[in-house]
Design a protein with these regions (language model features):
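Bacterial N-terminal signal peptides that target proteins for export
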Residues: 1-8
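Enrichment for repetitive, rod-forming helical segments
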Residues: 9-10, 52
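Hydrophobic h-region of N-terminal signal peptides that target proteins for export
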Residues: 10-18
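Sequence context surrounding c-type heme c attachment/ligation sites in exported
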Residues: 20-140
Length: 140
């Protein structure tokens, strides 16, 4: 009986997530080539966050900061060619993306201070923007 209760609880907790997945995200229309470019950028962002987490786990906070600034921070914008996609993005989506890049630059500075708990908290501000964007928008 206890197992049954746990299964019911898990299903109950999963319902809001499923409801959010089903249609509350705003569709963003992009030409196919730009859509693929944006998806590629987002996959690179995810791989970068993975690399940063590994470096933090190894105690290499300076390196984690360098990677963050180079690949996610404000310094990375030219490499991502994001400016040509901005006109296709809703203003709120642009703001969320820009805030992610600012948060990554702030993380880079925090990581270089060498305080792992503060660096991890700062990194969460980067991923908060990722979560917000993915919860609110869907490329079409």
């Amino acid at each position: 009986m206890r197992k049954f209760g746990m299964v019911l609880l898990a299903l109950f907790l999963a319902l809001p997530v499923r409801a959010a997945e089903q249609g509350e995200r705003r569709k963003v229309e992009l030409p196919e080539m730009m859509k693929q470019h944006m998806l590629s950028n987002m996959r690179d962002h995810l791989a970068t966050i993975n690399q940063i987490q590994a470096l933090l786990g190894q105690g290499k906070l300076d390196q984690a900061g360098d990677v963050a600034e180079e690949r996610l921070g404000m310094s990375s914008l030219a490499a991502h060619n994001a400016a040509h996609m901005a006109p296709y993005m809703p203003p709120e989506m642009q703001t969320t993306g820009t805030e992610m890049h600012h948060a990554a630059s702030r993380f880079a500075m925090t990581a270089k201070e060498g305080d792992l708990p503060r660096a991890l908290e700062s990194l969460s501000h980067v991923t908060t923007q990722c979560v917000a964007c993915h919860a609110g928008y869907r490329l079409n």
